[in-house]
Amino acid sequence: MVRMFADRGCQVIIFDVQDDKGETLAKELCDQGKKVVYKHVNLFDIDEIKNAYVWIKEQFGKLDYAMNNAGFGIPAKPLDECTSEEVNKVIGICLIAVTNCMIEEIKIMKENGFGRIVNTTSGAGLLGIKGNSVYCAAKHGVVGVTKAAALDYATSNITINAIAPGTIETELVNSLKEIAPDAYKQAEESNPSGHLGKPEDIANAAVFLCEDASSFINGVVLPVDSGCVAGK
């Protein structure tokens, strides 16, 4: 996703706590002439979040697009087997951090009279999934805050939408080929297309929701899953 926005000439700011990966990616793209900055931001720390957006405003004066893509999951299990620590971490990263970032993003966008926010939810934000009560709660929450906030700021030239990815060929998912080949095969076969999605599929959807062509699209959740949720 960072690459795709950078390829289109955007000044991209990465917020994360994985410093090695973030700094390596930023350097790689900067060496190619792209404009990318990595900034360490702990999304559990509201002061760090606020300070990060103050820094954006001071450095760049505006914020045109925001992609809230933070996520965290736990092994599937019944709700009563989840610990309070697990609940707090999943809800904290997947919903509370996203909401807190949106608040700061909207403040800057309102001042400039323009903004595009894209949140990442999941099929778990549209359906109930056995063994995933906490994750479903968080991702359903992202859907709710996306839709409600979209109505709040529609007259401010700010659109707020969400993407619901299916199973995507990330490093984690690809690792299943070796450690759990049956699970990987099941993931492939569960897609109507018969194969997994690629990171570029998600990035393309995010870019589209930030383009002028989508300026009248607001408050929607776009499944990017080859039709998985269509049949459920």
Locate predicted features.
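Short C-terminal tail/terminal secondary-structure segment
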Residues: 73-76, 127, 207, 218-232
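Residue(s) in the substrate-gating loop at a strand-loop-helix junction
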Residues: 122
